[in-house]
């Protein structure tokens, strides 16, 4: 059910067309982020190919990204959300989240999950809140990534 969607605002574009994505821009940001520090370009490429991706562009220049891991019916996990630093403060992350949550299939899901260390205020505006019963959730972490400092 991956239908290409595009949203335009002024000179900015959000697109789910993977053909527009700039893999090197995405990798450069993610490999320096707290959540994917040191990730290889092959892992980024593989994660993109197995996700619904949203690229944010100023003209043809990619300035943001997010991806959703989903079954397009019941559950989605939003990951790797970013706007490059020089474009922050323009409302682009809010527009990106609006676009994700309005995407056909995601809009009707039972649950959409994400993890953040520092953007709780942004996500709360979209109805995200801490897990009500965290004791019901479990996670299995790969020891290799823990040794690299990734969480």
Regions found by a protein language model. Name each.
Residues 87-96:
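Conserved acetyl-CoA pyrophosphate-binding loop and the N-cap/start of the following alpha-helix
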Residues 95-110:
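Conserved acyl-CoA
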Residues 3-10, 131-149:
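Short, basic/aromatic-enriched C-terminal tail that caps enzymatic domains
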Residues 42-82:
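A conserved beta-strand-loop-helix scaffold within acyl/acetyltransferase catalytic domains
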Residues 2-39, 149-151:
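Short amphipathic alpha-helix that is part of the acyltransferase structural core
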Residues 108-141:
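Conserved active-site alpha-helix within GNAT-family acetyltransferase domains
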């Amino acid at each position: 059910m991956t239908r290409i969607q595009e949203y335009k605002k002024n000179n900015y574009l959000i697109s789910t067309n993977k053909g527009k994505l700039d893999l090197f821009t995405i990798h450069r940001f993610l490999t320096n982020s707290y959540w994917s520090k040191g990730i290889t370009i092959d892992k980024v490429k593989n994660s993109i190919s197995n996700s619904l991706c949203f690229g944010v562009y100023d003209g043809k220049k990619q300035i943001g990204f997010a991806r959703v891991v989903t079954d397009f019916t019941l559950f989605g996990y939003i990951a790797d959300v970013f706007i490059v630093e020089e474009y922050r403060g323009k409302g682009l992350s809010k527009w990106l989240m609006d676009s994700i949550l309005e995407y056909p299939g995601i809009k009707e899901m039972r649950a959409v999950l994400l993890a953040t260390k520092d953007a709780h205020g942004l996500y709360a505006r979209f109805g995200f809140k801490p897990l009500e019963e965290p004791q019901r959730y479990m996670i299995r972490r790969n020891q290799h990534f823990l040794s690299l400092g990734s969480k």
